[in-house]
Amino acid sequence: MTFYGKDISGLHADLVAKKVSATELTKAAFDRIKATDDQVGAFLALNEEAALKQAAELDQAGIAEDQLLAGIPLAVKDNIVTKGLTTTAASKILENFKPVYDATVVEKLNAAGVINVGKVNLDEFAMGSSTENSAFKTTKNPWDLTRVPGGSSGGSAAAVAAGDVLGALGSDTGGSIRIPASFTGTVGMKPTYGRVSRWGLIAFGSSFDQIGWLTQSVKDNAILMSAIAGKDDRDMTSANQPVPDFAAGLNDQADIKGMKIAVPREYMEGLDDDVQEVIEASLKHLESLGATIDEVSLPHTKYGVPAYYILASSEASSNLQRFDGIRYGFRADDVKNLEDVYVKTRSQGFGDEVKLRIMLGTFSLSAGFYDAYFNKAAKVRRLIAQDFDDVLKDHDLIVGPTGTSTAFKIGAEIADPKQMYFNDVLTVTLNMAGLPGMSIPAGFSKDNGMPIGLQMIGKRFDEATIYKAGYVFEQTTDFHKQTPELG
């Protein structure tokens, strides 16, 4: 059994009616993982014994009508802490690290009866766009095993695209949910900054990071988002905003007639031909469904990537100071003194990309360069946020491509950090402004057959409008129904 064509509501109905058991679903997930993961490499750790025990307990107690997520197998990105289950952030410096507590989002899922089947791969400390920066393995794209799944939540996207699970938690600092969703033909939502607690997320850029979902369908994404959203007193950046039922209204009556959609001209520049063709067809389809399409400008988009990498790397250089070999994690051998512990532990424990970003961030924050780099980047961030506000005053959504290309070949860009960074040109600005955005399947390349994603951006705390538009688009196309051919 795969989870292709399945959905949370349907599986829940079967669980309540005892047409299927939580144990059967959980075993099916592990059978599928074992059948595909030698090829794909999505998982870093399996939680099989604990998951089957939890499933048996749910079956014994029975699953009630109001326990929508009970018995549903899902996966967790390995930079989100899980009590007693290794959490490595795909870094040697945290190899074999077992946290003593659960992240808030994991607590909420546990309380809802979700079955965590395991932890999935990522770029080390979520720094990357291809999942090639993991210290442990390179995850492959289920649509073409010679190509990347995107990053940094590549393991999450690959697990969903491979039919291992219906959904997987990811995190998005500059596109790390949306780019993998686009590359793998899945649905990826980065919610508004503050919508979901970051407590228990291993920090990369604290003012950029946000936890979200990768799923096979828009409705499942909406259901799961409602389950993890909300204020958390342990995270001072989480917002005290009411959490709607995001899936309410996602039915046959949903429509987008009269919805005002903005398309930034900057987002339609420099696209591969196949991406441009798919996005233009998607915009025409939205128009045929009753939306109005306006061309607009987000003039500071071109400054987004350099400003983002200065700011996010500066935050990373601070956040990663805690990994020093003293309290937990990897510690180098053959050290002579305390300074030696720090230097050798960090030199041996961090990968090249992490070291590069620490150095960039430290340089940007150093005396004599702070004003020239960090302060200027912070000003650009404010201008980018203002651009979005100006457009969204008169529009319901901003729509465009998620990325400029389809998934690239493994190894094609890893040696050129600058080229890799510019894969994020259409996603980083959203994190700088703290807005919600979702990538949904919009078509396939005629050139290489790879998926192409459409990005929908909304107003702060208005994920509901994004879900509505995404659902209507999804239900009037069949791109989400197509699946890769895996053994």
Swiss-Prot record:
Q: Which reaction does it catalyse?
A: L-glutamyl-tRNA(Gln) + L-glutamine + ATP + H2O = L-glutaminyl-tRNA(Gln) + L-glutamate + ADP + phosphate + H(+)
Instruction: Indicate whether Repressor appears among the record's keywords.
Output: no
Domain of life (superkingdom):
Bacteria
GO:BP terms for this protein? translation
Which EC number(s) does UniProt give? 6.3.5.7
| Active-site residues from the entry | K77, S152, S176
Q: Which GO terms describe its cellular component?
A: glutamyl-tRNA(Gln) amidotransferase complex
GO molecular function, a single term: ATP binding
Q: Cite a single Pfam family from the UniProt record.
A: Amidase
Q: Does the keyword Ligase apply?
A: yes
UniProt keywords (A-Z) are:
ATP-binding, Ligase, Nucleotide-binding, Protein biosynthesis
Its biological purpose: Allows the formation of correctly charged Gln-tRNA(Gln) through the transamidation of misacylated Glu-tRNA(Gln) in organisms which lack glutaminyl-tRNA synthetase. The reaction takes place in the presence of glutamine and ATP through an activated gamma-phospho-Glu-tRNA(Gln).
Q: Which family does it belong to?
A: Belongs to the amidase family. GatA subfamily.
Q: How does this protein assemble?
A: Heterotrimer of A, B and C subunits.
Q: Which PANTHER family match?
A: GLUTAMYL-TRNA(GLN) AMIDOTRANSFERASE SUBUNIT A, TRANSAMIDASE
Identification of the protein by name = Glutamyl-tRNA(Gln) amidotransferase subunit A
Q: Which organism is it from?
A: Limosilactobacillus fermentum (strain NBRC 3956 / LMG 18251)
